[in-house]
């Protein structure tokens, strides 16, 4: 089934499955991609329910399984879930803050069959890291766990979400990652969804900051290549400084399948913000969800595209851009992504750039992600 969204051919399998095991998290990062109203979402899937999700997704062709959150380490059944995924033949990776990790759990995960670990940091110094995380001593714990991950022999990605308050320390960030023997360094400039969108005025870097950071990253790439160093640097820019939108997730429901903690199935991490009814694995099979559900077919292909996207010769590359970003900025999920210079709403992006230059919010005004604030947001929306 391809309707209602498009005339596209039958979609391929969901190759990448992301299991958002929980929205619970010990940290309070102001750029978290979790929904603002996470406090209102229902009970988490049980161990047995998650394993059934893994089984069904594997039958559909999923090959890679990421364990995410929130903080997936708060799930006491994580080792069991890893073992079940390994038994089904997945390549598995754990995406974690490192808080709640221990040498014993790292060894336990290795025994269960975990393939890969990504550890996130907030900054390259303890004071800023812990301020952004909303947790004292988080930095010291992260350092210890990154070293323990390497000692266990895992391939390790160190991830830094960069923004206006830490991006100027990009060189120190890279140096720290090399000291910790990272195999990959992901320098991911903040993407503005969830809590990051709420705090955009305090997080969006200036163009000059981004250009400097990218220049330094490229210099380090050249230096490491000349040394024959195996570490790879990945630099992700925000599309707020582009004139064409990103091809979000490689196209709506084309290869990525996200399962939220309560079992809601989504074509991307942020799609539950949209005015679209998405199915739940407690009520439908993954085969039905992926191939036949309204939500997953809503923006597949290109029949749904408005002008100027419909007649644009670039629509096969960007698919009209990000539906979540279009909705966040315009209130219309079908609108052309305002990042695109051809969009009638591109002025919203230009305004955001100007604000980053002229009137950014200070670090002290960032709203931290936590259950109490989420509950306040939920109440305000219901009034």
Curated annotation (Swiss-Prot):
Protein name, entry field: PqqA peptide cyclase
Lineage: Bacteria, Pseudomonadati, Pseudomonadota, Gammaproteobacteria, Pseudomonadales
Cofactor binding: number and manner: Binds 1 [4Fe-4S] cluster. The cluster is coordinated with 3 cysteines and an exchangeable S-adenosyl-L-methionine.
Pathway annotation: Cofactor biosynthesis; pyrroloquinoline quinone biosynthesis
One of the record's GO molecular function terms: S-adenosyl-L-methionine binding
Catalytic activity: [PQQ precursor protein] + S-adenosyl-L-methionine = E-Y cross-linked-[PQQ precursor protein] + 5'-deoxyadenosine + L-methionine + H(+)
Domain Radical SAM core: from-to ranges: 11-226
Annotated EC: 1.21.98.4
Family: Belongs to the radical SAM superfamily. PqqE family.
Record gene name: pqqE
């Amino acid at each position: 089934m391809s309707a209602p969204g498009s005339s596209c051919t039958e979609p391929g399998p969901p190759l990448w499955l992301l299991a958002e095991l929980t929205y619970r998290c010990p940290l309070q990062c102001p750029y978290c991609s979790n929904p603002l109203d996470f406090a209102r979402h229902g009970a988490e899937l049980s161990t047995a329910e998650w394993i059934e999700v893994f089984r069904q997704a594997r039958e559909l062709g999923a090959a890679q399984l990421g364990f995410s959150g929130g903080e997936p380490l708060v799930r006491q059944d994580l080792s069991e879930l890893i073992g079940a995924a390994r038994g089904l033949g997945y390549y598995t990776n754990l995406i974690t803050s490192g808080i709640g990790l221990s040498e014993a759990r790292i060894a336990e995960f290795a025994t269960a069959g975990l393939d890969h670990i990504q550890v996130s940091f907030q900054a390259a110094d303890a004071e800023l890291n812990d301020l952004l995380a909303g947790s004292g001593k988080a930095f010291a714990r992260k350092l210890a766990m990154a070293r323990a991950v390497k000692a266990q022999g895992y391939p390790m990605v160190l991830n830094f979400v960069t923004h206006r308050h830490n991006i100027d320390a990009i060189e120190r960030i890279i140096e720290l990652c090399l000291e910790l023997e990272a195999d990959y360094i992901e320098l991911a400039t903040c993407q503005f969804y969830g809590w990051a969108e709420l705090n955009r005025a305090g997080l969006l870097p200036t163009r000059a900051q981004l250009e400097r950071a990218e220049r330094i990253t490229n210099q380090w790439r050249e230096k490491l290549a000349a040394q024959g160093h195996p570490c790879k640097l990945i630099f992700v820019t925000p599309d707020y400084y582009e004139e064409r939108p990103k091809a979000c997730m490689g196209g709506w429901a084309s290869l990525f399948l996200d399962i939220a903690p309560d079992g809601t199935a989504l074509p991307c991490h942020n799609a539950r913000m949209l005015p679209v009814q998405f199915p739940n694995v407690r009520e439908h099979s993954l085969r039905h969800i992926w191939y036949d559900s309204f939500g997953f077919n809503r923006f597949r292909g290109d029949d749904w595209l408005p002008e100027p996207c419909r007649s644009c010769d670039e629509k096969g590359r960007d698919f009209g851009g990000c539906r979540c970003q279009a909705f966040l900025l315009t209130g219309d999920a079908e609108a052309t992504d305002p990042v695109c210079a051809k969009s009638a709403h591109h002025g919203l992006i230009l305004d955001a750039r100007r604000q980053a230059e002229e009137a950014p919010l200070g670090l002290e005004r960032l709203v931290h992600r936590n259950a109490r604030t989420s509950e306040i947001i939920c109440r305000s929306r219901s009034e």
